[in-house]
Amino acid sequence: MALVRGGWLWRQSSILRRWKRNWFALWLDGTLGYYHDETAQDEEDRVVIHFNVRDIKVGQECQDVQPPEGRSRDGLLTVNLREGSRLHLCAETRDDAIAWKTALMEANSTPAPAGATVPPRSRRVCPKVRCTSLSWKPCKVERRIWVRVYSPYQDYYEVVPPNAHEATYVRSYYGPPYGPGVTHVIVREDPCYSSGAPLAMGMLAGAATGAALGSLMWSPCWF
């Protein structure tokens, strides 16, 4: 892309209203870019000039802006764009400001040549962002049943969990296995789960407790 005009200009920021010195390049396609230096490699921004300029004020016509410190008001330029924004610039001399005004007005009215391409906006490398997606999987909940059984020998309720085979072993005696007065209840859960399974287990546990209590109540009558 051919360069129409290039040079150093002061530019006022739109937010903080601070002046900064940049290298400006007016390209043949009707765009005005400003860079950190004259190599025009690291571009800060670019403004469309072609058919986008309403008017340009120079020098003392720029009443609503103050020049940079140590610079004359004669070098000021205010470019009013059709989109509503303004570009406040300041050249080294009044002649330089007038030359920039002439070049910008010609770029505004001159049609872009056929085959004109826009130069690269910037060669700054942006960090790459790596996106990852996580798939949702349902949680597996292991079903366990806990049974409370009254122990007549210890006089308290014990909670007995099931083993790995879904079988609950309730033993009301903690002495030697198969000793006198021992009650063994084995409760096996039906592989097909139903809402009545906890009730059935409760009934069996209650029957075992009742049998143990009954044997204790009638045991004095045998002596």
From Swiss-Prot:
Looking up CDD domains in the UniProt record yields: PH_evt
The alphabetized UniProt keywords are:
Cytoplasm, Developmental protein, Membrane
* Alphabetical list of InterPro entries matching this protein: PH-like_dom_sf (IPR011993), PH_domain (IPR001849), PLEKHB1/2 (IPR039680)
The PH domain extends over 2-109
Q: In which tissues is it expressed?
A: Highly expressed in photoreceptor cells, oligodendrocytes and throughout the myelinated parts of the central nervous system. Detected in brain, liver, kidney, spleen and trachea.
Q: Give compartment(s).
A: Membrane; Cytoplasm
Q: Which SUPFAM superfamilies match?
A: PH domain-like
Under the heading SMART domains, the entry gives: PH
Q: Which GO terms describe its biological process?
A: regulation of cell differentiation
Q: Please provide one cellular component term from the Gene Ontology annotations of this protein.
A: cytoplasm
One Pfam family assigned to this protein is: PH
Question: What does the subunit section of this Swiss-Prot or TrEMBL entry state?
Answer: Homodimer. Interacts (via PH domain) with MYO1C. Interacts (via PH domain) with MYO7A. Binds transducins.
Checking PANTHER family in the record gives: EXPRESSED PROTEIN (PTHR14309), PLECKSTRIN HOMOLOGY DOMAIN-CONTAINING FAMILY B MEMBER 1 (PTHR14309:SF7)
Q: What is this protein called?
A: Pleckstrin homology domain-containing family B member 1
Q: What organism is the protein native to?
A: Rattus norvegicus (Rat)
Q: Which gene encodes it?
A: Plekhb1
